[in-house]
Curated annotation (Swiss-Prot):
The lineage of its organism: Eukaryota, Metazoa, Chordata, Craniata, Vertebrata. Residues 1-22 form the signal peptide. This is Gallinacin-11. It is found in: Secreted; Cytoplasmic granule. The keyword Signal applies. GO terms for cellular component: extracellular space. Has bactericidal activity. The keyword Secreted applies. Disulfide bonds join C30-C60, C37-C53, C43-C61. One of its GO terms (biological process) is defense response to Gram-negative bacterium. The gene is GAL11. Belongs to the beta-defensin family. It comes from the Eukaryota. GO terms for molecular function: CCR6 chemokine receptor binding.
Length: 104
């Protein structure tokens, strides 16, 4: 699994180095969260759906057995940047710049 992550990071770096060959933004975000883009609308276990990839044509699936957890898995709530958290919490939110809050 570590080798695959390293290879994906290298591929992402090379794609960004060549003008015009960058990944779509949603795909880059998925890979940044150690996710995988699949064609199915449902992720296989132990993966959880976490947004989209390839211009919303594929589903981003994040491994739930890793250290990366969605905000709701940890009992938090994703809030927009306009809302201040009383207590922030670690966790991934599907929308860019949103924050995972334990208490709002």
């Amino acid at each position: 699994m570590k080798l695959f992550s390293c290879l994906m990071a290298l591929l992402l770096f090379l794609l960004q180095a060549v003008p015009g060959l960058g990944l779509p933004r949603d795909t880059s975000r998925c890979v940044g969260y150690h996710g995988y883009c699949i064609r199915s609308k449902v992720c296989p276990k132990p993966f959880a759906a976490f947004g989209t990839c390839s211009w919303r044509q594929k589903t981003c699936c994040v491994d739930t057995t890793s250290d990366f957890h969605t905000c709701q898995d940890k009992g938090g709530h994703c809030v927009s940047p306009k809302i201040r958290c009383l207590e922030e919490q670690l966790g991934l939110c599907p929308l860019k710049r949103w924050t995972c809050c334990k208490e709002i």
